[in-house]
């Protein structure tokens, strides 16, 4: 069996694809896996690092909304679809599993031409254009939110890295806090703005950090590799404020934390919900408002707070985040609400949907 994954561009498209690849290999170590990608996407680094085959096709960016530019897409897609067809034929693909992004639509259209079953996973609450189109031809459609508008969709959550899906935060906490140089007992705020949205969060956290420390809160702050590291003057006897350029073991960061201040990308929301980590979500104010939609269900369930980017200030953090961190019972209740909303088994559920699509083709 050979499965082609179509989900390049950003980590939000690539990580669920790689989680599925890992799950497929756990079930059948002999399964062939090829990921479609473009030269400009993160997949050029992430896919080979995980040991999977990467096949490149030309990038055809899709507009987020219907615009006059949309008319030019079919012409630009032709060569890309042909390249995708050649990859499907070369690998003798049994299924194409798409996650959105630049490479998804060419992958779907190539699969449709060749009669290869299509399985779609949509991570965002508001589906992207590629998955809207691809869902018309798909044998199976999986979504991350229970109220998705994609027809025939099955709610499974988002496939997660195994280190996240199996994380026991309480059991790993002593090791995690020691790894980051944190106090083993103090309430801990984790801060990360992701690859795109760190600057605003960085500014606010650097301003509010002394007030949090005075209140007995320690901070682990992933500043972002492209951002300037803050100058920290640690006062004796104060809880630590630890800025780092990047965290490559997010499972340890989640285990070390009691709460997180972060953006609301679909993958972030899914991971925090799965591990039961309460968060103050600050949706990135770009696109179609999908980040706000991503966070709303878990916030409504009681597992987080939600604040617009323009309203995020040091005063807001003091008035809203600090009271949560200072209240163990409220932290417990928010953690329980988040974990009840989260899903840890989406990778295995999606594997089942891939097998169903392949089996239906041969009936």
Swiss-Prot record:
Record's GO cellular component terms: plasma membrane
Compartment(s) where it occurs, according to its Swiss-Prot or TrEMBL record: Cell membrane
One Pfam match: Glyco_tran_28_C
One Gene Ontology biological process: cell division
Entry membrane topology: Peripheral membrane protein
InterPro entries assigned to the protein according to its UniProt record, in alphabetical order: GlcNAc_MurG, Glyco_trans_28_C, GlycoTrans_28_N
Catalysed reaction equations from the record: di-trans,octa-cis-undecaprenyl diphospho-N-acetyl-alpha-D-muramoyl-L-alanyl-D-glutamyl-meso-2,6-diaminopimeloyl-D-alanyl-D-alanine + UDP-N-acetyl-alpha-D-glucosamine = di-trans,octa-cis-undecaprenyl diphospho-[N-acetyl-alpha-D-glucosaminyl-(1->4)]-N-acetyl-alpha-D-muramoyl-L-alanyl-D-glutamyl-meso-2,6-diaminopimeloyl-D-alanyl-D-alanine + UDP + H(+)
Family indicated by similarity: Belongs to the glycosyltransferase 28 family. MurG subfamily.
Function: Cell wall formation. Catalyzes the transfer of a GlcNAc subunit on undecaprenyl-pyrophosphoryl-MurNAc-pentapeptide (lipid intermediate I) to form undecaprenyl-pyrophosphoryl-MurNAc-(pentapeptide)GlcNAc (lipid intermediate II).
Protein name: UDP-N-acetylglucosamine--N-acetylmuramyl-(pentapeptide) pyrophosphoryl-undecaprenol N-acetylglucosamine transferase
Organism the protein comes from: Streptomyces avermitilis (strain ATCC 31267 / DSM 46492 / JCM 5070 / NBRC 14893 / NCIMB 12804 / NRRL 8165 / MA-4680)
Gene that this polypeptide is encoded by: murG
